[in-house]
């Protein structure tokens, strides 16, 4: 499922997005955000993060730099014992 979603996103980025123009209010475009979210968190959770991001893409949101949240199991400890 993850591979299919990533292929669909790649298709969108190469063939559909250039026709629509560059009008994203966020630094990572929604399609880049979706690719990163799906790669990091899998298809279900990645789609959930993507859905929440697309909901934010509206005139009342300032936009800016928005990254995919890192899950606790994927993060590395900040303090290492020596």
Swiss-Prot record:
Keywords: Cell inner membrane, Cell membrane, Membrane. Transmembrane segments: none annotated. It is a peripheral membrane protein. The keyword Membrane applies. It comes from the Bacteria. Disulfide bonds: none annotated. It is found in: Cell inner membrane. One of its GO terms (cellular component) is plasma membrane. Belongs to the UPF0161 family. Could be involved in insertion of integral membrane proteins into the membrane. This is Putative membrane protein insertion efficiency factor. It comes from Rickettsia peacockii (strain Rustic).
């Amino acid at each position: 499922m993850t591979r299919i979603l990533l292929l669909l996103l790649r298709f969108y980025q190469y063939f559909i997005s250039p026709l629509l123009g560059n009008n994203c209010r966020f630094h990572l475009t929604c399609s880049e955000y979706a690719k990163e979210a799906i790669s990091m968190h899998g298809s279900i959770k990645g789609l959930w993060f993507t859905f929440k991001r697309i909901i934010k893409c509206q005139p009342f949101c300032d936009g800016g730099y928005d990254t995919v949240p890192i899950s606790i199991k994927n993060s590395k400890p900040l303090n290492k014992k020596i």
